[in-house]
Curated annotation (Swiss-Prot):
Function: Component of the ubiquinol-cytochrome c reductase complex (complex III or cytochrome b-c1 complex) that is part of the mitochondrial respiratory chain. The b-c1 complex mediates electron transfer from ubiquinol to cytochrome c. Contributes to the generation of a proton gradient across the mitochondrial membrane that is then used for ATP synthesis.
Organism: Alexandromys fortis (Reed vole)
PROSITE patterns recorded: CYTB_CTER (PS51003), CYTB_NTER (PS51002)
InterPro entries: Cyt_b/b6_C (IPR005798), Cyt_b/b6_C_sf (IPR036150), Cyt_b/b6_N (IPR005797), Cytb/b6-like_sf (IPR027387), Cytochrome_b (IPR030689), Cytochrome_b_C_euk/bac (IPR048260), Cytochrome_b_N_euk/bac (IPR048259), Di-haem_cyt_TM (IPR016174)
Gene: MT-CYB
Primary subcellular site in the record, as a coarse category: mitochondrion
Protein name: Cytochrome b
This protein's UniProt keywords: Electron transport, Heme, Iron, Membrane, Metal-binding, Mitochondrion, Mitochondrion inner membrane, Respiratory chain, Transmembrane, Transmembrane helix, Transport, Ubiquinone
Transmembrane regions: 33-53, 77-98, 113-133, 178-198, 226-246, 288-308, 320-340, 347-367
């Protein structure tokens, strides 16, 4: 009798994706982040669903409804903090996942990579709108500042901003539509994830050597299911330590003050995972230029396959580009730090230097390093 997992139409699909999937025999723990991101998405959807049962998207009651969740709902405080810190864990995994992709040249699987870039934009949009919902000071002013950037678009800018706001300022209409979008987007993200996986399984996974591994495959289950499970345990442990012991460490104290359109906080800044992009935005004195740099700071990832000059796929055997890569990582950490600092000397000049370095390393230095390595190794 044939095994049901190989005959049943639905189970067969799942089996080919998770159980009998041929996987490279040498993929390291850097390949765990895909499954961890899946777990983060599930956690966010579930906690978000339970929060939505008690949340009201009205400017007069939004803040107090979040307070009510934390005070009066059974384990409401836990659900709320799991959702808030779950977003941070999501972005940590995302950045590591993207970093892995850049290091090992996974961007050469163009369809999978571009789908990933679209996913990154979708997750960032979702997180931004979610941050507005508690209707604290930083929620309100963050929404005002970021949506207002669209007014830099020539000719249609002002109309576009007022259309998104649903009025002449961030108000009830804005909050209601942000809640609607924040609710629907994770389900769209889930659909995009399936497409991401579909494209991935067309080519098969990359591996740390960057070489073709078709001759050396092992079944995904049990080898990588058990390996993913270890990653999941570590993630959940870090996540619960963060949620139960330091729930507010990544948040902004200003968001515990109800939104007040008449009182601007001294330093408006987004959540930590947007700070690098915010620093790039602020480093350009021109409004439209800043907006373009902000978008390009993420969109530049889509150019990675075009900027690849090396005859080798991964950075495993490329010390010069490796050096550039780790300088880029350090540069992103500097940008993240600068994004949270006030706009004054010396932070302005540090931010501008780090922003120039960011684009220079990706667009100029890494491609040149690839060519130099080709010459050194006579790979022309």
């Amino acid at each position: 009798m044939t095994v049901i997992r190989k005959t049943h139409p639905l189970i067969k699909m799942i089996n080919h994706s998770f159980x009998d999937l041929p996987a490279p025999s040498n993929i390291s723990s850097w390949w765990n982040f895909g499954s961890l991101l899946g777990l983060c998405l599930i956690i966010q959807i579930l906690t978000g669903l339970f929060l939505a049962m008690h949340y009201t998207s009205d400017t007069t009651t939004a803040f107090s409804s979040v307070a009510h969740i934390c005070r009066d709902v059974n384990y409401g405080w836990l659900i709320r903090y799991m959702h808030a810190n779950g977003a941070s864990m999501f972005f940590i995994c995302l950045f590591l996942h993207v970093g892995r992709g850049i290091y090992y040249g996974s961007y050469n699987m163009t369809e999978t990579w571009n789908m990933g870039v679209i996913l990154l934009f979708a997750v960032m949009a979702t997180a931004f709108m979610g941050y507005v919902l508690p209707w604290g000071q930083m929620s309100f002013w963050g929404a005002t500042v970021i949506t207002n950037l669209l007014s830099a678009i020539p000719y249609i800018g002002t109309t576009l901003v007022e259309w998104i706001w649903g009025g002449f300022s961030v108000d009830k209409a804005t909050l209601t539509r942000f809640f609607a979008f924040h609710f629907i987007l994770p389900f769209i993200i889930t659909a995009l994830v399936l497409v991401h996986l579909l494209f991935l399984h067309e080519t098969g996974s990359n591996n740390p050597t960057g070489l073709n591994s078709d001759t050396d495959k092992i079944p995904f289950h049990p080898y990588y299911t058990i390996k993913d499970f270890l990653g999941i345990l570590i993630l959940l442990m870090v996540f619960m330590i963060l949620t139960l012991f330091f729930p507010d460490i990544l948040g902004d104290p200003d968001n515990y003050t109800p939104a007040n359109p008449l009182n601007t906080p001294p330093h408006i800044k987004p959540e930590w995972y947007f700070l690098f992009a915010y620093a790039i935005l602020r480093s350009i004195p021109n409004k439209l230029g800043g907006v373009l740099a902000l978008i390009l700071s993420i969109l530049i990832l889509a150019l990675m396959p075009i900027l690849h000059t090396s005859k080798q796929r991964a950075l495993t055997f490329r010390p010069i580009t490796q050096t550039m890569y780790w300088i880029l990582v350090a540069d992103l950490l500097i940008l993240t730090w600068i994004g949270g600092q006030p706009v004054e000397y010396p932070f302005i000049i540090i931010g501008q230097t780090a922003s120039i370095a960011y684009f220079t390393i990706i667009m100029i230095l890494m491609p040149i390093a690839g060519m130099i390595e080709n010459n050194i190794l006579d790979l022309e």
